[in-house]
Amino acid sequence: MANKMVGKGKLPVESEDAQKLRFQAELEFVQCLANPNYLHFLAQRGFFKDSNFINYLKYLLHWKDPEMAKYLKYPMCLYFLDLLQYEHFRREIVNAQCCKFIDDQAILLWQHYTRRRTRLTSLGTTSLTGLAVGGQPVGGGVQGPLLSNEPLPMANNNNNTNSTNANNPQAPGQQQQQNGAPMIQQNGLSNNTGMSGGVMGSGARDGGGVNLSGQKVS
């Protein structure tokens, strides 16, 4: 279908088929710019010295818009499209050594980017799985050094002792003496002597209790 003229001196209105064809041609050409060897090919044949071709490269900048860029399979082409806007780059890309250097750097970038992206994705998945709310992991995740640098809470003997006393209430006389054995207290730690007179947990002796300082208690 032929293009229709809107009026005298006006640009023709493209038909739907013509717009589709132009879209496909631009999409293919823009993505070819991701290949440094293709840029070297164009430079050797003098395309980058043609003012019309340079204007066309400026026109192609509309592919950087999100609505157009979403169709690109090789987004690296937009980086080279920006470089082609500079005369210095258009002049240097004709050099084979420059082209080889850019090609090698692009390959290294893709290799390291893939590895780095895989590693970051793996760490991100672990962080989301072990995301803590109120100090507790959600979804069965395990918190590790990568997820939290906060020190682990230390055990509080005073709280444990108070909790034990609260769960097992006793009369004041019973707390101080149980089964005829005195209560020994040092540094806030209570140690109850057993029937044999030894300190509960360590230092048991027959016939008398031993406090935490090693002195014998009758």
From Swiss-Prot:
GO terms for molecular function: transcription coregulator activity. The keyword Iron does not apply. Residues 155-187 have a biased composition (Low complexity). This is Mediator of RNA polymerase II transcription subunit 31. GO terms for cellular component: mediator complex. Its main location: nucleus. It comes from the Eukaryota. One of its GO terms (biological process) is regulation of DNA-templated transcription.
